[in-house]
C-alpha cells in the first residue's frame, strides 16, 4: 500500500439509535447484542480460537445500564471481567444527545455510570459520540468532571460534514476552568462497512463519495477492500493528514442497533495475512 498510513484501528460497535424502532425493541436488541458479544468472546477463550481477541465496544452507557438491569449476578461479573480483559469497551456517553440535554442531567447520569463501573474495577476514561453533529459544552463538562479524558466522535453526513472541512483530526477542547478533553473528530460511524471490512457490505453512506468502489470483475472482497483503503488513505495524505494511523468505526451489518459480527476478526486476519507486509 503506497501510503505512510500503516495502521487502521477498528472500533466495532453497535450504533445506538433509540428512534429507529419501538424503544422496547431497541433495548431488547442492545441487551442481546451484549450477550452475543460475551458468548463470542467466551467461545474464543475456551477453544483458543481467534474470537478470543474479539473486541466489542458499547457505544453508549444506556445499553450497558439496560443490560445490567436485566443480567444475573454471574452475567454482571463475566461482563466486567471481559471489560477488564480488554474484550469489551465502555463509553462514558449515556446516549447520543443533541444540545437540548441539560448539564445537570448529563452530569448525574455520567457520575452514576462512573460509580458503577469503578465498583467493578473498570473505571471509564473514554467516550464515543455518533450520528449527532456536535456536543454541548455542558456535555463536555459532564465528561471532564467525571474522569473522561478522551472523546471519539462520528459525524452524521446527511446533516453536516467535517468542521473546517477536515476529517480524522484531533483537538483539545478546553473548558472555562482550564480542564481539557482530547477529541478525535472522526468519520461516519459506518466507515468500516463502506470500505468493505465486512465482506457482506460495501455500500457508501455518501452517494457523492468517489472512494468506495466494488470491482464487479473480481469477487474477492479482500482485493476490493485493499483498493478502497488505498484510495481512502491516499486521500487523507493528499489533504495533509499527518499521522501514520487512521480510525474506522464498523458495525456487524450496515444498520443502526446492529449485532456483533465475529466474521470481522477473520476478515482482518485474512487481510493482514495477504497484505500485512506492504
Q: Predicted regions: what is each one?
A:
Residues 1-278:
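Catalytic-domain carbohydrate-binding cleft regions of carbohydrate-active enzymes
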